Amino acid sequence: MWQIVFFTLSCDLVRAAAYNNFRRSMDSIGRRQYQVQHGSCSYTFLLPETDNCRSPGSYVPNAVQRDAPLDYDDSVQRLQVLENIMENNTQWLIKLENYIQDNMKKEMVEMQQNAVQNQTAVMIEIGTNLLNQTAEQTRKLTDVEAQVLNQTTRLELQLLEHSLSTNKLEKQILDQTSEINKLQDKNSFLEKKVLDMEDKHIVQLRSIKEEKDQLQVLVSKQNSIIEELEKQLVTATVNNSVLQKQQHDLMETVHSLLTMISPSKSPKDTFVAKEEQIIYRDCAEVFKSGLTTNGIYTLTFPNSTEEIKAYCDMETSGGGWTVIQRREDGSVDFQRTWKEYKVGFGNPSGEHWLGNEFVFQVTNQQPYVLKIHLKDWEGNEAYSLYEHFYLSGEELNYRIHLKGLTGTAGKISSISQPGNDFSTKDADNDKCICKCSQMLTGGWWFDACGPSNLNGMYYPQRQNTNKFNGIKWYYWKGSGYSLKGTTMMIRPADF
């Protein structure tokens, strides 16, 4: 930049010197400007006006005089003077330029060196100041950076803690959401199940109401029948008394006649026929004696003269079966007392219960088998055969004992094992806090309350399903199916 300034000043000085020299040499000549360009410099000259030139008014106005040539010698002389002057000035300017270039180089170098030294000192001072300021700014920036780093580290730690806490909370939220979804699913399932149970309960309540109405009708009919039977019983009792009196009179008459006819015979000979009467303990003995027809036979309690009427099945599986229970038409009410189940009730040729006491005494004399024959309302039949069966005495509530199940009415025994005590409506010996005999009706070997009850309420066809208190054998038809008919019969194991 200093070189450019210096060169500009030099050009101005040269131009000024040339101008002054030319003006001094041209003082006597008229002034006219003439500019010359040389290199980077431009020169302006003031040229004199010629006195020998004529004025426009001195010319002849006609065309011949205007086209006539001027004075040639005078013009040539003036041009030569001007050329000489121009040549001298040019030579002088060239010398001046060379002088300026030779002499000004040293000064320009010195000026450049001085400018560089001054600039260097200034720049060094400026650089020193800048370095000091930079160092101060760097120190401040270092402090700020350390503070920022500490603050950033603290924020990163807080952010990490918040992130861990957030992850933990998110995990807890996910777990709680999953648990809520599970609970919602379970709640939906339970609600659906409750609705289904409500529907089932409504159906069952309707069915129970219908059963209740039917039972009320049946009870009314049975009450009428009972009243009629009571009347018939009174009549039969009266007739029986008359018949017994007549029989007694006839026996006395016969005895008198026998005494009159054979006065020599002793009383022992009179009752020979009675002493020769055959005693049967069960239907197997009846069968072995040659009586092989189904029917009612008189059996005698073991070690006793007490007799009982029993139905003997002489055809099923070889015969010799003593029937201890039969259900076929619902004509007999099996909701009886303990005493009635002990001695038996019903008609041996139809629905009846033979009696727990007789079965206990018979089955404790020798090993017996128990066969249970079942019928459903669709015409199907099945059976369960227990290879060993006996009852305990009344002191043990006629507890049942069974072993060795075979048959087609289920692979599992529907009579719970080990043996259960017998229960009736007035003797609750089951294993339930409820009273199974009252709930399910009938006397049976209830557990709590167990999968079977062949002495339950008798239901006719199309009313025999969904009955919890009917005649049931769970492992053949389920708990809600009431059977059409059942037969329980016993026979010695060695028959």
UniProtKB/Swiss-Prot annotation:
One Gene Ontology CC term in the entry: collagen-containing extracellular matrix
Keywords: Angiogenesis, Calcium, Coiled coil, Developmental protein, Differentiation, Disulfide bond, Glycoprotein, Metal-binding, Secreted, Signal
Coiled coil: 165-247
Gene3D superfamilies the record matches: Gamma Fibrinogen, chain A, domain 1, Gamma-fibrinogen Carboxyl Terminal Fragment, domain 2
Gene Ontology process terms (BP): angiogenesis; blood coagulation; cell differentiation; gene expression; negative regulation of angiogenesis; negative regulation of blood vessel endothelial cell migration; negative regulation of cell-substrate adhesion; negative regulation of positive chemotaxis
Recorded domain comment: The Fibrinogen C-terminal domain mediates interaction with the TEK/TIE2 receptor.
Designated name of the protein: Angiopoietin-2
Native species: Canis lupus familiaris (Dog)
